[in-house]
Amino acid sequence: MFLVRRIFKVKKGTARQAADIITQIGKMYEQAGLRTSSRVYISGSTVPGPSDTVYMDWIEESLKSAYRKDNPTPAKEDELFGILEDQYQEETSVEFYEIYSV
């Protein structure tokens, strides 16, 4: 099993608003049956850590290409990512971890 963590660096002071959109994105993938439930969390406001940063993580049984032919696109994917990218996101990256114990 793998933990996948996506990191979003967002515009100053917009972490909570961006986290709302990112939460919707996670639920969209979960409802489409494409992903397990995700957690969304922030750092840098009331806790130490990089400022204006939102994280989303979830667990995958195996790592697969997001561009594979059998990977459907959820209905609101373009809309939600469009809002995120236009209004909040400055950059994003993805980290992968192999789960050792649960």
Features from the language model and the residues they span:
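General helical secondary-structure elements
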Residues: M1-F2, R35
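Active-site-flanking beta-strand signature of metal-NTP-handling nucleotidyl enzymes
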Residues: F2-F8, Y55-D57
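Short, surface-exposed ligand-recognition loops at beta-strand->loop->(often short) alpha-helix junctions
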Residues: V10-D20
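An amphipathic, aromatic/His-enriched active-site/gating alpha helix that lines ligand/cofactor pockets
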Residues: Q24-R39, P50, W58-E95
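Short, charge-rich, low-complexity interaction segments located
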Residues: V47-T53
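Short, low-order "capping/linker" segments at domain edges
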Residues: F96-V102
